[in-house]
Amino acid sequence: MEVKSAKELKRISKELQENFLNRWKLLNLEQDKDRLKSLTEKAEDPNLWNNPEEARLVSQKKNELEKKLNPWFTIQQDILDFPDLVDLTLDEKGENGVGELSSEYNRLQEKFEELELLGALKNPEDLKPAFLNIHPGAGGTESQDWAEMLLRMYTRYFEKKGYQYSLIDVQAGDGAGIKNATLHVIGDFAFGFLKGENGVHRLVRISPFDANKRRHTSFVSVHVSPEIDDDIDIKIEEKDIRVDVYRSSGAGGQHVNTTDSAVRITHMPSGIVVACQNERSQIKNRDTAFKMLKARLYELEQEKAKEELEKKSGEKKDITWGSQIRSYVFHPYNLVKDHRTDHETGNVAAVMDGDIEPFILAYLKTL
């Protein structure tokens, strides 16, 4: 934004300060700040470590609050002091000071807009690691190939974002692509940033598997769930689950498992099936599979509660888990479009190489 006068600069500097204070109040950040102070004092108490479990919980909650608040602390004083800086500089330099202050205003405004997006990630689970599952729809090789393309798109995004990820389950397709894949993603606000990817992703292209070079439409569903802490009580009855062990079905090579260490858990009441095969240890794979099941059951309970609330309030959901959220058109033109936000780009190659942050941010702005 180009600031044209000292009068305008004074006005927008005060607006920025007011917007920051309003957002701080709206998000109850002062309460969070007090909670962080209390947790920090607890963490510094040597007696806390007499109870390792309590110490772990205090440390975890403290770290989560720090992740949430530190971006606000970083910019808070600069924004609150900016109107005074404007007054002092303009008193000294007059209109000649507008240029240098204009660039500082733009920097602060940009940082504040980033904070507003983080403010949309206000649920506790938004801070958590995430499980991302990719599952092709009907269509055989065509949709399985599309699933593998999406798997690459997401892994490239994680690499650019600085997120750690591991492929904890993958099932090879029939000749090409994949039948199923699950990723474990760790990073700041991992679930918060990825939750908007829930839904059906549609591809339109000339099929490389069709000798007649006809145009095909393929569908893949993406499901994202947060990793749930041990302190959240999700009861899983032994009688409600079936545990199967099997040999890893990954891409192969020198590190392929030659023992039945992969684990699949079926939760019979809900029909939820989870699997993990990335570790050589059956015990570790079982632990990860149970974490995934716990995450899915927690999410199921959250959905039920949300639906019940919507029934009581008379609200109607516009978007369901099975909704088509985004189209990727390779032919007869190049376009990727999100149907919830109308955000779009013609640079399909960049999107498929992991450039999906603009789509994610556009979705977060709607929350």
UniProtKB/Swiss-Prot annotation:
Modification N5-methylglutamine occurs at:
Q254
Q: What keyword terms does UniProt attach to this protein?
A: Cytoplasm, Methylation, Protein biosynthesis
GO molecular function terms attached to this record: translation release factor activity, codon specific
Q: Where in the cell is it found?
A: Cytoplasm
Task: Give the main location.
Answer: cytoplasm
Q: What Gene3D superfamilies does this protein map onto?
A: 3.30.160.20, 3.30.70.1660, Release factor
Instruction: State the GO CC annotations.
Output: cytoplasm
PTM comment: Methylated by PrmC. Methylation increases the termination efficiency of RF2.
Q: Any keyword Protein biosynthesis? A: yes
Similarity comment: family membership: Belongs to the prokaryotic/mitochondrial release factor family.
The record's function comment reads:
Peptide chain release factor 2 directs the termination of translation in response to the peptide chain termination codons UGA and UAA.
Q: What is this protein called?
A: Peptide chain release factor 2
Q: What is the protein's species of origin?
A: Leptospira interrogans serogroup Icterohaemorrhagiae serovar copenhageni (strain Fiocruz L1-130)
Gene name, Swiss-Prot/TrEMBL: prfB
